[in-house]
Amino acid sequence: MSSKINFVKMHGLGNDFVIINKKDLTGTYDLSQLAKSMAKRHLGIGCDQFIIYEEQNDSYEMIIYNIDGSSAKLCGNATRCLAKLIYLDTGKKDITVVVGNKKLLCHVIDENNISVNVGGVSFNESWMPSRDKIWEFAERYMIDLKETICVDVGNPHLVIFSKLELQDQKIVGEKLQDKALFADGVNVNFAEVRDNKIYLSVWERGSGLTLACGSGACGSFAAGLKLGFIHSPCEVVFKHGSLIMKEENGNIIMQGPASLVAKGMYYCE
């Protein structure tokens, strides 16, 4: 006999999510398997990532799964979507979302414009390979990497400031999941800077190329600032819209839209 699960479908600039309130999970579920099932485009609901959230005192805990069932440490677009959903349900405009050990301070400016204080980023973490190793990788696969830098936004990102064709982005994104280079995989950002705008495409670990990536925007913005390619504020441009990024006292602030697509019932067999 199948069970029923209430869900919400949302997206941030085309980066889409199935979102479930934990209190609606009345049975016992393997969440990794549930994520894989619901994320299927033709046999499920379809999404880039699967989100479970739960209210805890004055904040909301968010747990993120990729379409392959693996867990993710952060998602900027999902954070804006969850903030909007909570605002629509409760009227709250200032919302704290907790993901792992990171607290994200969200403010709903209006229904279509949400800002998120992502906090600081790091350019020196144990997971980051040496620059020489990255260049060895590039030479092995004959990839022209003009400028690369690793950045930790709460999840790992490699930012490549080099224009690559879509088919090459897929190849590079997949090849960079080499365990010898990045033990837990890495999100790969392909960034092109023009007129203080970053035109961005992101290969997300566990999901592949997506239409937008909020944490990728944060990481690429921070990397661009560090390398002197851009200044704050800056627009990060994706296929279906933009995010406005700025730096305040060492914190990265992301501002942009979130869209409610549907609410429904999923029949879990």
From Swiss-Prot:
Broadest EC class assigned to this enzyme: isomerase
Involved pathway(s): Amino-acid biosynthesis; L-lysine biosynthesis via DAP pathway; DL-2,6-diaminopimelate from LL-2,6-diaminopimelate: step 1/1
GO BP of this protein: lysine biosynthetic process via diaminopimelate
Active site, renumbered: 75 (proton donor), 213 (proton acceptor)
EC number: 5.1.1.7
InterPro entries: DAP_epimerase_AS, DAP_epimerase_DapF
GO cellular component, one term: cytosol
One Pfam entry name: DAP_epimerase
Keyword Cytoplasm (UniProt): yes
Residue numbers marked as site, Could be important to modulate the pK values of the two catalytic cysteine residues: 157, 204
SUPFAM superfamilies assigned: Diaminopimelate epimerase-like (SSF54506)
Predominant location: cytoplasm
Binding site for substrate: 15, 49, 66, 76-77, 155, 187, 204-205, 214-215
Keyword Amino-acid biosynthesis in annotation: yes
Protein localization: Cytoplasm
Catalytic reactions of this protein: (2S,6S)-2,6-diaminopimelate = meso-2,6-diaminopimelate
Keywords, comma-separated and alphabetical: Amino-acid biosynthesis, Cytoplasm, Isomerase, Lysine biosynthesis
GO molecular function: diaminopimelate epimerase activity
Subunit structure, as described in the record: Homodimer.
Job of this protein: Catalyzes the stereoinversion of LL-2,6-diaminopimelate (L,L-DAP) to meso-diaminopimelate (meso-DAP), a precursor of L-lysine and an essential component of the bacterial peptidoglycan.
PANTHER family: DIAMINOPIMELATE EPIMERASE, DIAMINOPIMELATE EPIMERASE, CHLOROPLASTIC
Protein family per UniProt: Belongs to the diaminopimelate epimerase family.
Name of the protein described by the UniProt record: Diaminopimelate epimerase
Species annotation: Rickettsia bellii (strain OSU 85-389)
